[in-house]
Structures are given as C-alpha cells and as structure tokens.
Amino acid sequence: MVTLSNVGADVEKNIVPEVNDASKRDSDNASADFQPGVKRVRAVASVWSKKTLWLTFALLYLVAFVDMLLVSVQSTLNPFITSSFEKHGLLASVSIVATILSGCSTLTLAKIVDVWGRIEGFLFMLLVVVVALIMKATCKNMEAYVAAHTLYWTGHIGMIYCVDVMLADMTTLRNRMIMFSINNTPTIASTFAGPKIADLFFSNLNFRWAFGAFAIMLVGVSLPVIVIMLFMERKSVKAGFLVKEKSGRSAWESIKYHLIEFDVVGIVLITASFALILLPFSIVVYAPKGWATGYIIAMEVVGVVCGAIFLAWERFLAPVQFLPFKYLKNPTIIGSCLLYGVMFASALLTITTAGYVLNSFSLSSAILAPGIGLYTGNFKWAAYAGIPFMLLGTALLIPFRQPNTSIGAVTITQVLVGIGTSFFSVCGQLAVMSVVSHQEVAVVLAIWGMFGSIGASVGLAVAGAMWNNILPSQLYRRLPEESKAMAAQIFGDMQLQMSYLDGTPERDAIVGAYADVQRKMVIAGVCMMPLVMASIVIWRNVNIKKQEEEEGSQTTGNIF
C-alpha cells in the first residue's frame, strides 16, 4: 500500500508513484460529500512535503504582511483624502458601503472557493484589489474615490478570507488558531510602519503614489503562492489523487449554473437593504430638509422592502440559499457571529501619531493572539477572559476623551481593548469551525465575516450619524465670532483644521468639539458590552483537543 506521506515525498522529487489503492483515493478525494474546490485542496495536501507546506505558510505570511501594511497606510490616509475633496464628513459613508458589500460578498466567495477552487478565489480577489488601487491612484473626485474604496475593501476582505480558508485547509483544528494568530502578527510591524509610510507619501509625494506602489508589491508577493498551489495541484493529478472532470455544460448553461449557485439575486438584495437603511444616518446632515427629505425617506423604505424581499427569496424561492440558515440554528455559530458583530470604537495629531493611537489595539491583539491560540482548548472560558479587558478599555475612554488627557492614556485604553479583542477573535473563529466538517469551513468563516462586517457597518452608521449631526453644531458653538462663518469649511477640511496652531481659539474650538462627539460615541460603545457576554453564553463548551483525539482530524493529508 502507498501511504500519503510516501506519495508526498515521491511527488516532491518529481516521481509519480503508482497508486493502486483506489478505494482509499476515492474515499479521501473523490467523495461526493466534497465539492470540487475542497477535493482539490485535499488532494494537494496529500502530495506536498513538509518543506512545501512551510514554504506556503511563509508566502501566505508575506501576503498578509503587505496587505496589512496597505490597510494601515490607506486607513491613515483616508481622512486626508476625503478632506482633499472637501468631503471629510463623508468618511463614514465611504466606509459603510465598502464594509457592507465586502461582508456580504464573502458568502459568494465561499461558493467560489468551494466550487472553483481556493486559488481561483484568491486570484479573483487579487485582481479586484489591483484594479481598485489603480482607480484610487487616478481618481479625480469623491464619487470615483468612493467606488474605488468600495472595490478595494471588497477585494481586501476577500483576499484575507481566502488566506484564512487556505490556512484552515493546511492545519488541524487544534493547531489552526496558532497559525491564524501568527499570520496576524504583521500587524505589529504595520502599526508602526504604516502611519510613517503614509506620512512620507503624503508629505513628499502624494497619496496616489502610495496606492500605485502597493499594487505592484501585492502582485509580487501573491504570484508565488498561486504558482506553488497550481504546481502542486498538477502533481496531485499525476499522482492520481485528483481526477479532473468536465461539467458537460454549454457556455450559457455554465453562466446560468453559476448565477444560481452564487445566488446573485440574494447578494444584491441584502447589500442594497443594509446600504439603504444605514447610509441615511451619515448623509442626512447634507439633505435639504434632514429626515423629511424625500430621497432619505425613500432610501429607508426601499431598504426595508429589499430586506423583506431577501428573506422571502431565501426562504421560498432561491434554488441555492445565499445565507445557509441551517448554520444559524447552531448556538455556537450564531453566538460567535453575534460576538464578532458587536465589536467597535484619534485626537488632532500628526498623521503618524494618529495612526499609532488608532492601531494600538490591533498591535496588542496581534502580540497576544498566538499565545492564546496555543493554549486554547476550552475556547468558551478563554473568551470570557477577554470581557474585563474590553469593558475596562472602552469604559476608561469616557473620562479620557478630554482635550487635556495625555495621548499615552488614550493609547493604554486601546491596548486594553486589543487584549480583549485578541481573546474574542481567536476564540470566535475557533468556535464556528469546531462544530462543522472540512466541507463547511469556508461557509461558516464567510458567515462569521459577514456578521462582523454588518456589525461594523452598524457601528459606522451610528458613529457617522453622531459625527455629522453633533460635530458641526459643536464646532459652530465653540468657534470665535470672527470664524463662525467658516464652520462648515473647517468641518469638511482636515488640513485646514490642522493649520491652526495650538493655543489659538480656533484650534481649541476644534479640539473641544472633537472631544465632545467622541465621548458620546464611546458611551454608545459601552452600552453594547452586555451583548458581548450574551453572545458567549450560548456557545457550546467544546474542548477541541479532546474532540480531535476522539473524532480524528477535520482536514487530511500532510498538514500542520
């Protein structure tokens, strides 16, 4: 009999062994229980060596590093870019549309990686990101930037999702969160490097060069991953672990099949629903009659109607459900998704320093997460441990959101939130994957990500509404009489805000207005904390170490 490890060693030496155990091959890789994309990755895992496995880990780490660095750079630049178009107040609106679409699209991407393959999904998302970065680098107005940012964020979330799915394919459940957490450690570097890089581009060149440079870098680190995976898939075909079958469908039949399989109607309806319901909270301040404006009312009504149609479509009409409701009946999955959906929270600083404060919670999360992933067996109790840190960090921001508070104190609160987040992120992902088979890992990760995006978009909508409705009035009230006429211009232009020197009446008014609205945002965030506890309570208490000892590994082949 030819064992999987022997086959892997032989194939790595370009020797194609003769595989006689047809029954084993059929049960492992050609089972009807697995979709084509899952079969392909299980076949690849059966033929590669440990060296190739670790090389792939390293290359995926490089992809994550460049991607996280780009996120840090563009997040730091975003307020200044919207301000350059004199639309700084629309920052939340830009993020809401992007967050909703990216979250909803991951379920469609889950279908792509399961039906077509992991690499096909990764390559598609890479193409989306590159096109979006080119659009960002060449945009001439706010409308073009909104479109580019929406496309970019969809591609970014999709790429990270594909990396997570591939890491899940390459690991046992017991060791998965170690690799997930390690793959998130580039945040440690991007926290410090990202804002500084953004500052250098913004000060010495412009934001357009930043996006162009990162488009080239992202392609450079992604291509080796694609080449290795395609090469190993070819090896698995030669070894007999994978049999490629033709669908037998015509071109039109293939288009129809994929439109149904990816439930395009469902994704359009749910994206439209959340976008139309949440966007008015951020843009109502620009409407002529506020909430009484016709198009604001129409957006809310159409959004609710789209939501109702989506539920009816998914329940009674959709041949393939966009949102697999059967998974939402599992308390561990729904609890983890709700937890991820509940999580949210800079002072007028330089670009670099503001970025450090903004990213400090991600930094502490990245440092602690690998250790938590290593020791987490009963993940439910580990998640409980994150609640005090999250509550303390968020609550302390209420008194600390004052102009005279040191930046160090604000940063400490973000570190505390990051510690809590590290528990939640590690344990939450582990929770959703612990109760499904390899076949369903991509889908439950997509659902988990969708809930996070919806929660983030709700948070952005609330924050955007408070920002756009409270800040202008506070700014007007605090500005000296001779500057009140410029209140609207100051509100929309961040560079103009920073041009006023410390100690001037205008600068004091701006800082005071920011502190007031941010303090109210933090109070709203603290009110969400009871939902965190409730979300964890309903999890099943699964010990994943004992589970794998009793039931065997979730994945197969030469894995970590």
Curated annotation (Swiss-Prot):
Chief place where the protein resides: membrane
GO cellular component: plasma membrane
Its membrane topology: Multi-pass membrane protein
Keywords noted in UniProt: Glycoprotein, Membrane, Transmembrane, Transmembrane helix
Organism of provenance: Ajellomyces capsulatus
PANTHER family in the cross-refs: MAJOR FACILITATOR SUPERFAMILY (PTHR23501), TRANSPORTER, PUTATIVE (AFU_ORTHOLOGUE AFUA_7G04730)-RELATED (PTHR23501:SF107)
Keyword Hydrolase found: no
Listed transmembrane segments: 53-73, 90-110, 115-135, 146-166, 177-194, 211-231, 264-284, 291-311, 331-351, 354-374, 379-399, 407-427, 441-461, 522-542
Family: Belongs to the major facilitator superfamily.
Compartmental location: Membrane
Induction: Expression is induced during iron deprivation.
Described function: Major facilitator transporter involved in siderophore transport.
Glycosylated residues in this chain: 29, 404
Domain of life per record: Eukaryota
InterPro entries documented for this protein: MFS, MFS_trans_sf
Protein name: MFS siderochrome iron transporter 1
GO molecular function: transmembrane transporter activity
Pfam families registered for this protein in UniProt: MFS_1 (PF07690)
